[in-house]
Regions:
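Short acidic/polar hinge/loop motifs at secondary-structure boundaries
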Residues: 124-151
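Outer-membrane beta-barrel signature, preferentially recognizing the C-terminal barrel domain
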Residues: 262-285, 321, 376-378, 426-428, ...
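Flexible loop and strand-edge segments within Gram-negative outer membrane beta-barrel domains
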Residues: 217-224, 228, 242-325
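Extracytoplasmic beta-strand/coil segments of soluble accessory domains associated
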Residues: 76-124
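Gram-negative outer-membrane beta-barrel transporters
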Residues: 390-393, 481-484, 498-568, 591-598, ...
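Short strand-turn segments of transmembrane beta-barrel domains in outer membranes
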Residues: 166, 171-201, 212, 217-224
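Short, acidic, small-residue-rich periplasmic hinge/interaction motif at the N-terminus
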Residues: 21-67, 75
Length: 628
């Protein structure tokens, strides 16, 4: 099936729903609304909004699904649920950082390791201040009430790095008076242990959430151990009927060992990583207006031993880095007249990074040649406005513009425009055009011999057409996109230059259908064509899941297929195809105790996601959940 065929199918479906009939009366629309599922999201709109009125494609993963996965990391659940989204892996547990690491998030041929995917926590950006990539080991399941994933550029609202999409982690907080406590303990293959404890409390105006987690594993290859500690705390206070405040902090520390690839082993390589996040916000909610002012920071301290290739030798220095992303964000969303919504906001970010080396023997800072060390301060300030207007009962238009000024690259204009048409039978037809961009990183500007202080931002335009129908019985969606961009940063003659181009197009499909009261089928598929392929982007990804629920039992069988996943590009292009079969089951013994078990790669498939890093064959985990 080619793109023209799918466009024809979408157009025919839309027409058959009678969306063009202006005679639709209020009673018909009310009936449609009662049959559809009204989903409220915050990603892509700043303030909360009904996804049926937004021209964006947002997937929401709720707390119940996060808990049912029994994963300590959020990312495996996100990969299963979002069409086309990929996260690289090299072992059973632990992504790591630096050379040989995994955790690279990709979507539509745009990748997080290049700063083209943005992760948010409560709407605040999270990335390394030197390399601008997400730190995938930081995103633990115990912090999340839900996760919202926006496919396609979101730079109009969130600025740099939101080229390929956004993953927004909304942190947990109790909404009703009372208290909840949970404890999870699990163990499995290769000495893997995962534990976490969470306590939540709310009394009148006050609410608190606190959690702590620990995990470790030997993994399936020698010298590939991983150990992690983490936790989060959140305090909320309702100042009045219209005003509330919250303070949120989380931290993680992990140690990761690195054996190198199977063809080029490395000895003695190890990483010690500490990451932290803190934010404070003041929120207002009135009948026709909502808004928020927040301050935030994310920071990290990295110490890395790169190891040596000779097993009889040892390295004599550590690579160290410090980075911080600190900012202020404010927005107000208001209804100016009937069926309208105007959102205006300002963002300020201060981005800091320092990279240097120290002696193992003395601890002193070493002088390095070839720009191996450096320090950078960059500032970014932006203002944006987004207007959403219902022209008719069944049609909404949306247009926005961001003006962003970066202290190095200057001023960038980022427009976005879209339209939604709603059918009488709970259908939504969406058209969207949006610009995405990212500013060059500290590494690209100042570190290592290829660095170039005259770099400009990367820029893309994304065009997409989608059809979705959400009812209480059957939900499905089809999305077509086309991406074209230039100014992509590449190394030419040993220097970073804005010369690369990108031209990608593809189709994304997802569907969920309850076969009866006990059995639900879910599936998603994506096809991607890239003029210039990139690592970690599969040409096809498909997920098929059966979820069975009966009494105290829950069983889920999931098959995930990857076709032509690029592990190397260029002259030595390499790609692989494989299918993974996973099975999980849980038994709720009583109101307090749940027992569960999970098996992954049950077919013992031999495959690689990172070139030279074979993944483990079949693995298993089992555990208990105690809820009070």
């Amino acid at each position: 099936m080619n793109i023209k065929s799918v466009i024809a199918i979408l157009a025919t479906s839309w027409a058959s729903q009678g969306v063009h009939a202006k005679t639709t009366n209020a009673q018909t629309m009310e009936s449609a609304d009662s049959a559809s599922i009204s989903e409220i999201v915050v990603t892509g709109t700043r303030g909360s909004g009904d996804i049926r009125h937004l021209p964006l494609n947002v997937t929401t993963i709720r707390r119940a699904e996060i808990e049912a996965s029994h994963e300590q990391s959020l990312l495996p659940t996100v990969v299963r649920r979002v069409p086309g989204l990929m996260v690289t892996s090299r072992a059973m547990k632990g992504y790591g950082v630096s050379t040989g690491s995994s955790g690279n998030i990709s979507l539509r041929g745009l990748v997080g390791s290049m700063g083209q995917m943005l992760v948010l926590i409560d709407g605040h950006p999270q990335y390394n201040g030197i390399y601008s990539h997400p730190i995938s080991d930081s995103y633990n399941a115990d912090m999340a009430e839900r996760v919202e994933i926006l496919r396609g550029p979101a730079s109009m609202l969130y600025g740099s790095n939101a080229m390929g999409g956004v993953i927004n982690i909304v942190t947990r907080q109790m909404d009703t008076d009372g208290c909840k406590t949970s404890l999870n303990i699990s163990g499995g293959s290769y000495g893997t242990i995962e534990t976490n404890a969470t306590a939540m409390w709310k009394q009148r105006k006050w609410s608190t959430t606190a959690s702590a987690n620990y995990g470790r594993t030997d993994n399936h290859r020698p010298h590939m151990g991983f150990e992690q500690w983490g936790g989060m705390a959140k305090v909320g206070y309702d100042i009045s009927k219209h005003w509330s405040a919250s303070i949120n902090a989380n931290a993680t520390a992990f140690t990761s060992r690195y054996p190198g690839s199977t063809d080029a082993p490395v000895y003695g390589a190890e990483q010690w990583i500490k990451r932290g996040v803190a934010s404070a916000s003041l929120t207002n909610r009135y009948g026709n207006s909502t808004g928020e002012v927040s301050v935030f920071t994310s920071f990290g301290f990295h110490k890395i031993d790169d190891g040596v290739k000779d097993p009889t030798a040892s390295s004599n220095r550590y690579f160290r880095s410090k980075d911080a992303l600190t900012g202020v964000s404010a927005y107000q969303s208001m209804r100016l007249w009937t069926d309208s919504r105007l959102t205006i906001g300002v963002d300020y970010q201060h981005i800091y990074g320092r990279a240097y080396y120290t002696s193992k023997e003395t601890g002193e800072v070493l002088n390095t040649a070839n720009k191996q060390s450096g320090r950078s301060y960059r500032n970014e300030i932006a203002g944006y406005a987004d207007l959403r207007q219902d022209l008719m009962e069944w049609m909404t238009i949306d247009a926005g513009l961001r003006i962003d000024h970066h202290s190095v690259t200057g001023t960038e204009l980022i427009p976005q425009v879209g339209m939604v048409a709603r059918t009488p039978k709970a259908g939504e037809f969406k058209v969207m055009a949006s610009k995405g961009y990212r500013n060059p990183t500290m590494r690209e500007l100042y570190l290592y011999p290829p660095s170039n202080e005259e770099l400009e931002p990367e820029r893309i335009w994304n065009y997409e057409l989608s059809w979705r129908r959400n009812t209480k019985g059957f939900n499905y969606g089809v999305n077509i996109f086309y991406i074209k961009g230039d100014n992509m940063i590449q190394v030419v003659n040993r220097k970073n230059v804005n010369t690369g181009k990108i031209e990608n197009h593809g189709i994304e499909i997802d569907m969920e259908y309850p076969l009866d009261n006990h059995l639900t089928v879910y599936t998603n598929h994506s096809w991607l064509k890239m003029k210039n392929p990139v690592v970690a982007a599969p040409e096809y990804k498909g997920v098929f899941a059966l979820n069975y629920h009966c009494g105290k039992w829950n069983v889920a069988l999931t098959a995930t297929e990857f076709t032509n996943l690029y592990t190397a590009v260029g002259e030595n292009e390499t790609k692989g195809s494989f299918m993974l079969l996973d099975l999980s089951a849980s038994y709720r013994a009583n109101s307090m105790l749940t027992l569960w078990a999970r098996g992954e790669n049950l077919l013992a498939e031999r495959y690689e996601i990172n070139l030279g890093y074979p993944m483990p064959k079949a693995t298993a985990m089992a555990g208990i959940c105690i809820s009070l």
